[in-house]
Amino acid sequence: MELLLLSNSTLPGKAWLEHALPLIAEQLQGRRSAVFIPFAGVTQTWDDYTAKTAAVLAPLGVSVTGIHSVVDPVAAIENAEIVIVGGGNTFQLLKQCRERGLLAPITDVVKRGALYIGWSAGANLACPTIRTTNDMPIVDPQGFDALNLFPLQINPHFTNALPEGHKGETREQRIRELLVVAPELTIIGLPEGNWITVSKGHATLGGPNTTYVFKAGEEAVPLEAGHRF
């Protein structure tokens, strides 16, 4: 399988998806036809989200079709060379994909060789479940099971920083709480600016920041770019 799982879409001082474009270009390998899954968009219309994505990827020669705009979305996915899943609200994303019967077709086409690109919620959707999302509002997706294209759980936008005076839990504390009730999980705290690529059977960490792996009853393990999972 070929996957590009990004923690986020925008870095300070850079345009939207600017840091991701070289990574996308490297993994295209001649693929040009993409379907875009815009359902995580809550505060922007799906048409606008699709147009924004298409404009950014046009210089790479990628044509983008919004899955919400086609008559037969399952067929569109089955014939896609690239599946792109945008960030936003993970619950809404999974709910829409499940209701439209898109989860199995996405899994199948990626396993047959299509490239999967997802940022934030799109990275969450590639995991076994969406239980490590940070998102609100919460809508009921009729279960948390997701695509299971990547075998570990990703927590995008990972940071342990707290505003001065804030008394709420750190992100690590929240992850530790999840590991108490679900000790079987392995969770990757993926900071903004970092990503995971899967190619030729290897998953590799990229990006400038330290990533952390959390398991129940164990200390967090720091990982740097180049680590293979």
Swiss-Prot record:
Q: Name one Pfam family in it.
A: Peptidase_S51
CDD domains documented for this protein? GAT1_Peptidase_E
Active site feature: S120 (charge relay system), D135 (charge relay system), H157 (charge relay system)
Q: What class of enzyme is it?
A: hydrolase
UniProt superkingdom: Bacteria
GO BP terms: namely: proteolysis
What subcellular locations does the record give?
Answer: Cytoplasm
Chief place where the protein resides: cytoplasm
Catalytic activity, reaction form: Dipeptidase E catalyzes the hydrolysis of dipeptides Asp-|-Xaa. It does not act on peptides with N-terminal Glu, Asn or Gln, nor does it cleave isoaspartyl peptides
Give UniProt keywords alphabetically: Cytoplasm, Dipeptidase, Hydrolase, Protease, Serine protease
Q: Does the keyword Hydrolase apply?
A: yes
Q: Which GO terms describe its molecular function?
A: dipeptidase activity; peptidase activity; serine-type peptidase activity
This protein's GO cellular component annotations are:
cytoplasm
Enzyme Commission number(s): 3.4.13.21
Which SUPFAM superfamilies would you find in this protein's record? Class I glutamine amidotransferase-like (SSF52317)
Q: Does the keyword Hydrolase apply?
A: yes
**Function in brief:** Hydrolyzes dipeptides containing N-terminal aspartate residues. May play a role in allowing the cell to use peptide aspartate to spare carbon otherwise required for the synthesis of the aspartate family of amino acids.
Family named by the database record:
Belongs to the peptidase S51 family.
Q: By what name is this protein known?
A: Peptidase E
Quote the gene name from the UniProt entry.
pepE
